[in-house]
Amino acid sequence: DYYASRGLGDVYKRQVFMDIFESLNSVLVDLFNDILNIEERALITEEFKDISVTDMHIIEAVGIEEPRTMSTISKSLGVTMGTLTVGINGLVKKGYVTRKRGEKDRRIVYASLTDKGIAAYRHHENFHKDMIENITKDLTKEEAEVLTKTFIRLEDFFHQLP
């Protein structure tokens, strides 16, 4: 190896690693912050000014299909039932979510979106669709596949964290 023959192998590798580490760290931190800021500006419009990005993520987790149990929603968001209950209570008061106890087992509580909640869900869905379209519009099929695989690995890493 060229660098090893000049006694620079380990030093060079360490420097390359640090450059990559610093670049990736900077990009990831900036990217997460940018996504949160952009999402907040894009999602909280005049129509939905009474909810936060966190509320919007709860709305997304409730979904537009059949009612979901509070337990299922809390697991999908990775939050405690207490935390979810506080968020759902606020969304019920604002008219985005309804709550109903199970008919067979009254201990089970189901949440579903109102028409207002469905409109917020669609707004959020369109934001994500537009974001993905803009990110991928200038990529080749191969570049899009590499980007997708990279994000899947990143997601897998985050899911393995305690």
Language model region names:
Residues 1-15:
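Single conserved hydrophobic/aromatic residue that forms the stacking wall/gate
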Residues 2, 52, 107:
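Exposed loop/turn and edge beta-strand positions of beta-sandwich/beta-sheet ligand-binding modules
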Residues 13-49:
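N-terminal leader segment of winged-helix/HTH proteins
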Residues 20-24, 31, 126-162:
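Terminal interaction helix/tail motif
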Residues 38-82:
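N-terminal helix-turn-helix DNA-binding core of bacterial DNA-binding proteins
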Residues 60-64, 125, 152:
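Short, locally clustered residues in the helix-turn-helix/winged-helix DNA-binding domain
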Residues 89-146:
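Charged, amphipathic alpha-helical coiled-coil/dimerization segments
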